[in-house]
Design a protein with these regions (language model features):
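Short, polar/acidic, helix-capping and beta-turn segments at strand->helix junctions
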Residues: 1-114
Length: 114
């Protein structure tokens, strides 16, 4: 059985199946912030969704990160490394991309175990 959360006409924010939690792409709510601020917002949203599923960041299986500008890579990494618990850094890919809204600097897609 697939459990879906916050289902809308286009997407669900999260789905759970066979002990695995899949998050939709998470983007910042306040896109006026700099890269560090946007990353912190996105990681907070990920924390909240994983908590709703009964999981947490220590159980992330994979994170795909899309950034608007590669010059923001150091700022992304600084916030990420402060957020990830020691010994629990998941596999991760970071690519430059044109995001759906030009003011977004980052979007993250996470898969986690329950």
């Amino acid at each position: 059985m697939v459990q879906r959360f916050d289902v809308g006409p286009r997407l669900s924010e999260m789905a759970i199946h066979n002990g695995v939690c899949y998050l939709a792409g998470q983007v910042p709510e306040d896109a006026t912030q700099d890269m560090a601020g946007q990353v912190a917002q996105v990681l907070g949203a990920i924390d909240a969704l994983l908590a709703r599923a009964g999981s947490d960041k220590r159980k992330i299986l994979m994170c795909q990160i899309y950034i608007k500008d590669l010059a923001d890579f150091p700022a992304l990494n600084a916030v990420w490394e402060a957020w990830v618990p020691a010994g629990h850094a998941p596999p991760r890919a970071t690519v430059q991309a044109h995001l759906a809204k030009p003011e977004w600097r980052v979007e993250m897609v996470v898969t986690a175990a329950l």
